[in-house]
Amino acid sequence: MGKIIGIDLGTTNSCVAVLENGQPKVIENSEGARTTPSVVAYMEDGEILVGAPAKRQAVTNAKNTIFASKRLIGRRFEEKEVQKDIDLMPFSIVKADNGDAWIDVRGKKLAPPQISAEVLRKMKKTAEDYLGEEVTEAVITVPAYFNDSQRQATKDAGRIAGLEVKRIINEPTAAALAFGMDKSEKGDKKIAVYDLGGGTFDISIIEIADVDGEKQFEVLATNGDTFLGGEDFDQRLIDYIVTEFKKEQGVDLKNDVMALQRLKEAAEKAKIELSSGQQTEINLPYITMDATGPKHLTMKITRAKFESLVDELIERSIEPCRVAIKDAGLKVSDIDDVILVGGQSRMPKVQEAVKTFFGKEPRRDVNPDEAVAVGAAIQGSVLSGERKDLLLLDVTPLSLGIETMGGIMTKLIQKNTTIPTKATQVFSTADDNQTAVTIHVLQGEREKAAANKSLGQFNLSDIPPAPRGLPQIEVTFDIDANGILHVSAKDKATGKQANITIQASSGLSEAEIEKMVRDAELNAEEDKKLAELVQARNQAEGLIHSVKKSLADYGDKIGSDEKARIEAAIKDAEEAVKGEDKAAIEAKSEELAKASQKLGEIMYAQAQAESQAAGEGQPDAGKKDDGNVVDAEFEEVKKDKQ
């Protein structure tokens, strides 16, 4: 059985890990980095760049470089958080036919799971290159406060990337696994995982217990905000710089996509620098121009100034902590350890706020960028049977129920219920002789049905006519270990049943997912062909260069016919290299190699003669010693050019 890898699919960065000989290993990508930017760029020629190469070209291709797409995954276009992002993002967020928020790239509408799938494919390839075998199964993490649609969309992204998602687990829970797995301290421990990432915030209260030699991780409560993260901190700084620049220069950078992209990079860098220094300078020459000429942006930002800009965001993260502790039935003083996860938790002011709230120093022995992927890999090893000393009990973050008479939400499963779980309740009809009922499934905490997230609806028909209140309709909610909901309704009189796996009232249909999987496979084939073409081109160019050099050095030692033949072969090869036909490039390279064979022989003879001439000056020149000559066959090793 192949390895089940662990993937932290982050808003800003992603990371992949695997368990080897019982130890988690974070795998470096092809650029040598342990984390990969969750950035995908769509080039004019159809090529798709992922990670650092995509991020590097963002300034010149801002409209087609997608970052933070996780903030849109499983979301409706109308949601206020999406509307807010429309004004901030350089790329175009559009309404899909099903009402979801999609992204328009070069005139083609793409679903956020398709974009996330490109990042997942890079993670899959990173693991395959390291392990030397195909990887088909993964555990993928999501923010604990993700709702059903967002979890389903993440699972879809895995499928599009060619991965069977064995389990979706919550990021703070994964971090707790990474933290608690190899801790030797005995006794129960209650920990708080404060996870402030690039786009989302989660707080989970988790109890780690030793039960008969088995480590049990039980999530007591979770809370969060799926639209609060490092991207928002960056945006506060960008807004401040734009406002100040407008005051000084009278130019509004908000309308200049390229300037904003440069500013985003600079703001992110400044934010990181301010975690260790008290002041930083943003220096962007030629940021824009007006009638008076080019404008340069130079601005000093102090740590105190930045902290004042984001103070309210940090405060926003503390309220969910209060709620989570209350929901867990604990006091702040009951928490034994606080773990910080997510890149934004490195900010000193964030650490200070966490320390003040919990009354203790957060732990420093967890890598905020890697802990989540490590935990996912540990869970993968449990699912594959490699580890048997661990039990994970997670919870559903939000209450689930159905809409009942008067537009009220009736809850069947309360938030923070341990999963997997099942709940059944009997309902009846609202009108006399009603022959059908619509089951409207909701997720959220509000009494008013319309104020909660609609997950989908389905009909149960052919109910025998009867006075209102008489028919008995049994509704069952079943949440699996991924936190994904299955709902069924049954008329107890007839036994007739209707059910759905919630794919959200929006979401991708099975046909759409399968089409995206096929497109992705097609893309992979195209990528392979492109790589082979580039390799053939590189080898041909290398040969052309070396033959040209040899011709310049030794051309006078061959006949004019021979020389003309080589020059013609060079010209043919140069023409072939300009084209897109791999077979033609290889054929013309072969012809050039044959045509230049005579030239190679002359070069070799010349080199040998020079070597002998040099050797004649040595004392033992001319002595022949065959005693230690080893017969060997030499094989030309063609090294692939990158």
UniProtKB/Swiss-Prot annotation:
InterPro entries, alphabetically? ATPase_NBD, Chaperone_DnaK, Heat_shock_70_CS, HSP70_C_sf, HSP70_peptide-bd_sf, Hsp_70_fam
**Composition bias, Low complexity:** 608-618
The record's region (Disordered) falls at 608-642
Taxonomic superkingdom: Bacteria
Annotated GO MF terms: ATP binding; ATP-dependent protein folding chaperone; unfolded protein binding
Q: One Pfam family of this protein, by short name? A: HSP70
| CDD domains in the record | ASKHA_NBD_HSP70_DnaK-like
User: What drives induction of this protein's expression?
Assistant: By stress conditions e.g. heat shock.
**Modification type Phosphothreonine: residues:** 200
Provide the alphabetized UniProt keywords.
Answer: ATP-binding, Chaperone, Nucleotide-binding, Phosphoprotein, Stress response
Q: What HAMAP family does the annotation carry? A: DnaK
Describe the function of this protein: Acts as a chaperone.
UniProt record similarity statement: Belongs to the heat shock protein 70 family.
Q: What is this protein called?
A: Chaperone protein DnaK
Question: Source species, please?
Answer: Laribacter hongkongensis (strain HLHK9)
Q: Which gene encodes it?
A: dnaK
